[in-house]
Amino acid sequence: MKYTLEGSNARVIAKAVQSLSKVGKEMFIEIDQQSLQMRAINATQSAVGSISFKRSMFEVYDMPPHSDFYCKISMKGCLAVFRNMNEVEYCELNLLDNQTNLQVNLRCKLETTKEATISIIDDQNINTNINTDQMPNIIRGDHKLLTDISNNFNSSEEELTLEANSGSVVAKNYIEGARVNDKFMRTQLKLKPSEFEQYQVTKETVITFCIKEFRAFLLFAECLNASLTLEFDEAGMPFLLKIKKHGEIECLLIMSTLSPDDISFSEDYCQKDLTVQDEDVRAAAAKRKSSVSKPNVTNKRKGSSSEPAAVQPKRRVEETQLESSLDNPLFQFRDSEAPSVQHPRILAEVDTVVLIEDEAEQEALMLAAADAALEASMAPAPEPPNSTEVCFINTDDSQQPKPAKSSSDEDETIPQSPERPNKVLGVLLGLLQGCVSRLKTMLRLDEHLISGYELL
């Protein structure tokens, strides 16, 4: 099989290879009795590009009757061959070695020839089952207009959104209500139907598609100086881009659009939707209220004047039932208290304490005595008169007998005892005697009270 083209048509094929290289990394070639088709599919299988060249473009189109051929080759190898085509005057394509290699011969100016061989990876082809002739919305415009629309957005943009209705079409780089970065710059461009060659939008639609493949086919349309046709239906349905030139070259780009279920909306936008839904629910509830209350109004008019007072509470009950059905919370709490909480006890008159005046005076006296004892314990204890204490520290292990004390000291000092509790008791008795003597002078109490306290 042999196919030859002149230089200008060979440069068109080179442009087609460059455009398809931006879609996928592999090229699928299909040759039949009518045309030669080149296809490419992206890695995510969301876009398929196809460019068809009719048989009339070739000078020699040697194809066996009732036969076809298809294969898959590397896109990188095609780009290396179809490069710098300005000097090419003639191009020849041949299938060699039992259709396992594709040979490309390029004859350039000054009688120079380039020859390259591209190996065939597999005899594989791709097809689509999408009906490309029944789309409700069709927009056709010059390639310059669509190129200007594309140039208004940054080259780093990945998606383009079109909002089309009967009055205008808006192209923007964002989705209304979707989550975006705070530093993201939003851009939109609004066009009138008069700026297009054909504007047929019968169904208001908002679609989002990938802009990378769209720009790749815009470059090929600029090379052909041809118009582009956009055909689409609704979000989630395929988006078609078609290019035709003199009935010899046909291009078709099929891209998937973003479904509304795959969009991550922001919380504010979701809140707006919820408020709108709440308003719709409330409006429906109001309609139901009016439909329920109408029979009551007619009954009131037919009855006597005393009936409205009896019917009015029924209407309020019905309204509260409707509102409670709409505003019914997920959780219901009871007004009962927890069983572990005890009620506060109220003291009765029997539980109250009544103090007698004499007992109150005695209690005050005891408290004053305790305070005085505490102060005396904090202050340094006075030494008894005419007494001398001498402390001896025995460093020897042997115990020596203690000297006997004189009888005169027994009345003035408290005898020492080896038992510590008796010593502490003696100190406390001495402190109490000192407190009593002080209370006699300060408080000037009666003699019978003081004598009773000494007896204690």
From Swiss-Prot:
Ranges that cross the membrane: none
Assembly information from the UniProt record: Component of the 9-1-1 checkpoint clamp complex consisting of Rad9 isoform A, Rad1 and Hus1-like; the interaction with Hus1-like is direct. Does not interact directly with Rad1; this interaction is probably mediated by Hus1-like. This complex probably also forms with Rad9 isoform B, however 9-1-1 complex containing Rad9 isoform A localizes to the nuclear periphery. Interacts with Brca2.
Family statement drawn from the similarity comment of this UniProt entry: Belongs to the rad9 family.
Motif position, Nuclear localization signal: 300-302
Species in which this protein is naturally found: Drosophila melanogaster (Fruit fly)
Gene Ontology cellular component annotations, sorted alphabetically: checkpoint clamp complex; nuclear membrane; nucleus
Domain of life where this protein originates: Eukaryota
Main function: Component of the Rad9-Rad1-Hus1 (9-1-1) checkpoint clamp complex.
Pfam families, per the entry: Rad9
Annotated tissue distribution: Expressed in ovary.
InterPro entries given in the database record: DNA_clamp_sf, Rad9, Rad9/Ddc1
Keywords in alphabetical order: Nucleus
Name recorded for this polypeptide: Cell cycle checkpoint control protein Rad9
